[in-house]
Regions:
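N-terminal intrinsically disordered/low-complexity leader segments
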Residues: 1-16, 203, 210-211
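Short, amphipathic alpha-helix enriched in basic
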Residues: 8-52, 60-67, 71
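Hydrophobic alpha-helical connector segments
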Residues: 80-115
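Amphipathic alpha-helical segments used for helix-helix packing
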Residues: 105-127, 131
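Amphipathic alpha-helical packing segments from all-alpha helical-bundle domains
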Residues: 124-146, 154-161, 165
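Hydrophobic/aromatic-rich alpha-helical bundle segments in the mid-to-C-terminal region
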Residues: 146-208
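Long, charge-rich low-complexity segments
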Residues: 198-227
């Protein structure tokens, strides 16, 4: 089992390490109970946390746990990237490495990710889905050393959101075991993007990418894994 990031700072939020411990423990129960109050209760028990703390830490229940899981995964991805013996210097290679790290680290919890995306794909959670997608691609750009501001700040993230969300769908369907199909898919997508830093999609592309991502999740995964 990969090392988990227990504490991180997400945009505008300092995440409680107790909440992180519950989410990490809950992952073992999601394949059986889905992202649910029951799974959270079991995770809290495994983490040695009193039951009453669950509702305090996750007032909206499972959807709050899903959001925290995504943010912890972002932190783990960034930490793993900076721990590489040699980080890629070219932007497209750094982005490639970050996307693959994000997915490789999630490989052991693939079913939990699938179920999380099923919930995020519901219309009621479209806004949160877009926010989490934005946070992930923003973390990727910043880890790659891109601190641009102004128009390019948004255009680059909109382009990366499209590449990452499409690759995530490919990863969910990849049963190769070694992610070979996912890697090939990502490389094709990156090749199709002539230059991510020169992308010209408007600001609204970030929001549109998130909403399109949510709809794609709902259509692709459907209700097969809804609990």
């Amino acid at each position: 089992m990969s090392k988990r990031i227990e504490l991180m700072t997400a945009p505008h939020n300092t995440i409680d390490p107790t909440a992180a411990a519950i989410v990490n423990a809950t992952l073992l129960h999601v394949p059986f109970d889905g992202w649910s109050d029951a799974a959270l209760a079991l995770g809290a028990a495994d983490a040695g946390v009193e039951p009453h703390m669950v509702s305090a830490l996750f007032p909206r229940g499972a959807i709050d746990a899903i959001a925290l899981h995504s943010r912890l995964a972002d932190a783990e991805m960034v930490a793993a990237f900076h721990a590489l013996p040699e980080t890629p210097q070219k932007i497209h290679l750094a982005i490639r490495a970050l996307i693959l790290l994000r997915l490789e680290l999630a490989q052991q919890n693939k079913d939990a990710v699938r179920r999380a995306l099923t919930m995020l794909a519901l219309p009621a959670h479209a806004k949160l889905s877009a926010e989490l997608l934005y946070e992930t691609v923003d973390a990727m750009w910043r880890a790659a050393g891109q601190t641009d501001t102004g128009f390019s700040f948004y255009t680059r993230r909109a382009t990366l959101a499209a590449v990452y969300s499409a690759t995530l769908l490919a990863w969910l369907a990849d049963n190769s075991g070694d992610m070979a199909k996912t890697v090939a898919f990502l490389d094709r997508r990156l090749a199709n993007v002539a230059s991510i830093p020169k992308a010209t999609a408007p600001l609204r592309g970030v929001k549109a990418a998130g909403e399109q991502f949510a709809r794609a999740m709902l259509k692709t995964i459907g209700r097969r894994h809804t609990r």
